[in-house]
Amino acid sequence: TDLLWGLRGGGGNFGVVVSLEFRLHPLTTVLSGLLLYPLDQARTVLHRFNEFIATAPDELTIRSGFLQIPDGQTVLFLSPTYCGSLEMGEQAIAPLRTFGTVLVDQMQSVSYHELIHSNDAFTPKGRHGYLQTQSLEGLQTETIEALIEQGLPLPSPFSAINIHHFHGAASRVGVSETAFALRQDHLMVELIAAWEPQDDEQRYIQWAQNLSQALASYAFKGGYINLLSEQEQERVRLAFGSNYERLLDLKRKYDPDDVFRSTIGHLAPNSLTR
């Protein structure tokens, strides 16, 4: 029982899962796509987005952020996904089109398979990348200003700021029910620095680190566990929060020699955090 608890958020710290049975839920098509807005309307759109998601239904999740389109222009995007009837989905996302001037509207009904693979083109083989994350309770004036004033311009056409919307059923799980500790509605800001192999990586890494630091004082402690590096052990501890000591006990019990150490969210059994 303890091991199963630890696996739900504790990653590969305790072993390798060789067999898994899980329940599927039918989901054939979803309403999804991109809405693009001009950069000079970003503050207004993001404030309205922040107000809107407070009452969003479970069936709707909305990513937001900044990206560069093929003509070199940086734009703000909203990317809703509605898992339900097309008619209800259209009603749910209709207000988003009033938040500002919609430059491009790519909302459409797509298969779930298409949705899962819709970002494949952004991660071609050979491209280098570096990620930082901060989780915010919401967007306030200060965080919006940090995103715009310190995050832009993006350091390359392949880089982006991706704001993930976490809410619904996952927020109704008790903090101690699984190892994953952040069980409340929040926004996870993913800072994606990407560059070609011949470029100077330090410029891109510095961009992500500087923006992450600018957001840190407004963020929950830690970060998104799946995107924390081996060098961010203190953030790993903070991300697991009140579940960290229980996870550490499991690590010491089942893997005291740290055989399973090449893992995201690594727990060192000899940790001196007690």
Task: List each model region and its residues.
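Soluble FAD-dependent oxygen oxidases
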Residues: T1-R274
